[in-house]
């Protein structure tokens, strides 16, 4: 580029210099105000004095630990928080539930991030709809909540596989979850490379609500791999920087804290414990696992209630007892997070499960995650626990509290007539042959690429006149056995339901005498009822996990036929099935007493005349057997009223619409004798032989 020479005279030089200065002022006057408004352009604060006040404001935003206290922008801060899970509440209700938490007096929301919701298949990321974490965090910010983000990768949370994607179970060689297994950590890193950059702009120091990020969850109750924990800290810091508080949560015992804490000064160790425990000796123990001056007392899971499994009495905790226990913490400047402030619903197939001392002692969670929390499953706050906790919290949170919102209106839409549209074996005929897996022996659900729902196993055998004995040593979780006379060229026969064997009650099944011109076909329908989310048995593959024995001999030659339906974060796929089979004649004739045991789809419709009539409702499954239900193709969860205690499934109003609403039920056993369902205006936990009881945890 050629250089321009200046004129020789001083007057000319001064004239041109003045002209150029004027030009520069004009350009600066136009250019800077316009382009300073464009956020996509980078700039330094020194070059743009008008931006300095905003930067100073950002620098002043700081949440930190000092002198055994939490500090927010230079002021001591007491965390009075609550767990509320975006994935258990429809997005249309996020703000409503947060407003109710605000009215309770909370200043902080703690929330898990379930990996399996966001990466249901390897590399397929979902951050829309009920998985829109960023929108949820921004909504918390809008409503002046701080956020404690529990990033996992393991979360527990009574959520399928503790939040791990089930496809991890199919990786070969077998992954060692929750350890420093390098292949497992590489997959965690790939996940966090997506998740944590979404969180970074929402950190408190960056103008967002996130003040703390938790790694793992109650690790001291599971393992002792410090290298694993240090690696998670390193990955989190790599994305989020050194200013964010990284924390762990463990039970309030020396053993669990010894194993679950990270022995570095920049990781904060929080504790959880039973509501009835004296908190202050536990907080004293907590200090031993934090650096000097870095141990503000925090119960990161103050239990407002407890979970309930199918077949148990619904858990209830006394309101005044719970409130008094909370006050023991808050009155001495301790911090606490209510677990849960609002439980919500295990929509889809995402409910978790527990085991006892044996893997076979399997206990799946209810669809409802009400948790006896102060904000009920449907958002109701007109209850003694909300009022008692609110009374205590108001003593310690001086910020203005909004008026408590009124309860959501509910409507009983009445009886819904149902009709059988599709049998299980109609669905089988519709299955693409390319989706059917063949193998000498049964293989797991995960190994055929199916993570949720049902898997049908098919084989054949030569029936004895004296009958046969079938044994499945290891089935996860529940298997219904059918036999029929079928052949490739004769697709007609009598389907017989023979019996059911369960993971927790595994018994041999006697196959009756059946006369077929060809081999007898054997069908075993296995239901995945939810993966274990806590304890040593979280490696919870589903399906038939052993050889199948017929009269003591291994039965070979199997087909695996997927029947997945759709889950919470998948596209609905019922429409084709319903339309394709609605008017088909059934090719199976059902025997009188057992015919009602054939799994089948039932459908019904109900109408809503106006937008004003769209309200929350509940579907009562009294008189039905066991299955899963879909409202307008949304999977609202499992029902099992014969076992209880949950009788009804919650249907939030945003799932409904003006005009015709469609209900589809996949019934595994026995439909209601009148083939009808009732839409009622209340929850009911009195089914089975179970009644409520009060537990003081």
Swiss-Prot record:
Glycans are attached at residues 333, 519, 573, 583, 690. Its EC number is 3.2.1.23. Keywords: Apoplast, Glycoprotein, Glycosidase, Hydrolase, Secreted, Signal. The keyword Transcription does not apply. Pfam families: BetaGal_ABD_1, BetaGal_gal-bd, Glyco_hydro_35. The active site is at 218 (proton donor), 301 (nucleophile). Residues 1-35 form the signal peptide. Its main location: secreted. SUPFAM superfamilies: (Trans)glycosidases, Galactose-binding domain-like. It catalyses: Hydrolysis of terminal non-reducing beta-D-galactose residues in beta-D-galactosides. Belongs to the glycosyl hydrolase 35 family. This is Beta-galactosidase 17. It comes from Arabidopsis thaliana.
């Amino acid at each position: 580029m050629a250089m321009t020479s200046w004129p020789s005279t001083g007057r000319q030089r001064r004239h041109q210099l003045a002209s150029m200065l004027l030009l520069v002022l004009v350009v600066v006057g136009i250019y800077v105000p316009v382009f300073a408004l464009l956020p996509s352009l980078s700039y330094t604060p020194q070059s743009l004095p008008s931006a300095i006040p905003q930067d100073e404001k950002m620098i002043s935003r700081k949440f930190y630990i000092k002198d055994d206290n939490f500090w927010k922008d230079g002021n001591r801060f007491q965390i009075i928080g609550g767990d509320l899970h975006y994935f258990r509440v429809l997005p249309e209700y996020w703000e409503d539930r947060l407003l109710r938490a605000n009215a309770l007096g909370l200043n902080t929301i703690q929330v898990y991030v379930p990996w399996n919701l966001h990466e249901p298949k390897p590399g397929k990321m979902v951050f829309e709809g009920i998985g829109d974490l960023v929108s949820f965090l921004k909504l918390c910010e809008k409503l002046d909540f701080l956020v404690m983000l529990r990033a996992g990768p393991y979360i527990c949370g009574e959520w399928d596989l503790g939040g791990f994607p089930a496809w991890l179970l199919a990786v070969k060689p077998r992954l060692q979850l929750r350890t420093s297994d390098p292949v497992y950590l590489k997959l965690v890193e790939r996940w966090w490379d997506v998740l944590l950059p979404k969180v970074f702009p929402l950190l408190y120091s960056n103008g967002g609500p996130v003040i703390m990020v938790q790694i793992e969850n109650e690790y001291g109750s599971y393992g002792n791999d410090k290298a694993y924990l240090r690696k998670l800290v390193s990955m989190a810091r790599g994305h989020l920087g050194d200013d964010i508080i990284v924390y762990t949560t463990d039970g309030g015992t020396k053993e669990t804290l010894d194993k679950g804490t990270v022995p570095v000064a920049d990781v904060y160790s929080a504790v959880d414990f039973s509501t009835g425990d004296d908190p202050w000796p536990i907080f004293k123990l907590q200090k031993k696992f934090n650096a000097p001056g870095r141990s503000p007392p925090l119960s990161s899971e103050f239990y407002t209630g407890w979970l309930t499994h199918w077949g148990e009495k619904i858990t209830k905790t006394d309101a005044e007892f719970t409130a008094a226990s909370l006050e023991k913490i808050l009155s001495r400047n301790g911090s606490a997070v209510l677990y849960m402030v609002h439980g919500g619903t295990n929509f889809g197939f995402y409910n978790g499960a527990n085991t006892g001392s044996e893997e076979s002692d399997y206990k799946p969670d209810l669809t409802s995650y009400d948790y006896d929390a102060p904000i009920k499953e449907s958002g109701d706050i007109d209850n003694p626990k909300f009022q008692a906790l609110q009374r205590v919290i108001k003593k310690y949170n001086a910020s203005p509290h909004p008026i408590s919102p009124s309860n959501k209106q509910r409507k009983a839409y009445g009886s819904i007539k149902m009709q059988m549209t599709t049998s299980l074996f109609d669905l089988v005929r519709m299955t693409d042959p390319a989706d059917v897996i063949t193998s000498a022996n049964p293989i797991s659900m995960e190994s055929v690429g199916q993570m949720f729902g049902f898997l049908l196993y098919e084989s054949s055998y030569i029936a004895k006149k004296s009958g046969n004995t079938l044994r499945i040593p290891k089935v996860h979780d529940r298997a219904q056995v059918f036999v029929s006379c079928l052949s490739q060229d004769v697709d007609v026969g009598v389907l017989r339901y023979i019996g059911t064997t369960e993971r927790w009650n595994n018994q041999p099944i006697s196959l009756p005498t059946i006369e077929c011109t060809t081999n007898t076909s054997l069908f075993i329908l296995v239901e995945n009822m939810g993966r274990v989310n806590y304890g040593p048995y979280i490696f919870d593959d589903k399906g038939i996990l052993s050889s199948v024995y017929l009269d003591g001999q291994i039965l070979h030659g199997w087909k695996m036929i997927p029947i997945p339906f759709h889950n919470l974060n998948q596209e609905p796929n019922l429409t084709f099935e319903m339309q394709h089979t609605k008017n088909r004649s059934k090719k199976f004739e059902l025997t009188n007493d057992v015919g009602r045991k054939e799994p089948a789809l039932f459908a019904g419709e109900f109408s809503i005349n106006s937008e004003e009539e769209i309200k929350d409702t509940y579907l009562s499954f009294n008189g039905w057997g066991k299955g899963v239900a879909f409202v307008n193709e949304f999977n609202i969860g499992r029902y099992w009223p014969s076992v209880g205690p949950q009788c009804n499934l919650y249907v939030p109003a945003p799932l409904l619409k003006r005009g015709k609403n469609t209900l589809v039920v996949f019934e595994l056993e026995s439909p209601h004798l009148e083939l009808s369902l009732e839409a009622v205006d209340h929850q009911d936990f009195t089914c089975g032989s179970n009644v409520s009881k009060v537990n003081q945890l």
